[in-house]
Regions:
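Nucleotide/pyrophosphate-binding catalytic subdomain
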Residues: 1-132
């Protein structure tokens, strides 16, 4: 069976143009099948600020109400995702941008409230991950 590399990048890479460029060049050079997982929290916060949507955090974790969910969906699945796809395409790396919701790739359920209700924050259902 062919190897599949799953690599996640965080804000330190996304928020640094030079680091992102270097990472994506290295990622594009991987000849095996690969999946890139990314966030975009700081970008979402900056855009939210411009749109008048306040970012709320408790203990460093984002509180995701309905409006914030719309914002992060736009930023992660749209803006950041498509920027990364465009850069990879420019590096002759065929890339397709999808989210966990696309094709029912990942299912999750709302995280139970313990001490703090983080809103629309969920936990991935391991049995619900489409590995095909």
């Amino acid at each position: 069976m062919e190897k599949l590399f799953v690599i996640k990048i965080g804000g330190n890479v996304l928020d640094n143009d030079a680091a992102l460029s270097a990472f994506l060049r290295a990622f594009a050079s991987i000849s095996e099948r690969k999946i890139l997982i990314h966030g975009g929290g700081k970008i979402a916060s900056r855009l939210g600020e411009r749109l008048g949507i306040e970012s709320k955090y408790i203990n460093g974790r984002r509180i995701t109400d309905a409006l914030t969910l719309d914002l992060v969906t736009m930023v992660y699945g749209g803006l950041v995702n498509k920027q990364i796809v465009a850069i990879l395409q420019s590096l002759s790396c065929d890339a397709l941008g999808v989210t966990g919701a696309d094709g029912n790739l990942i299912s999750a359920k709302k995280r139970p409230v313990k001490d703090i209700d983080y809103g629309f924050v969920g936990d991935i259902n391991p049995e619900g991950v489409n590995r095909d």
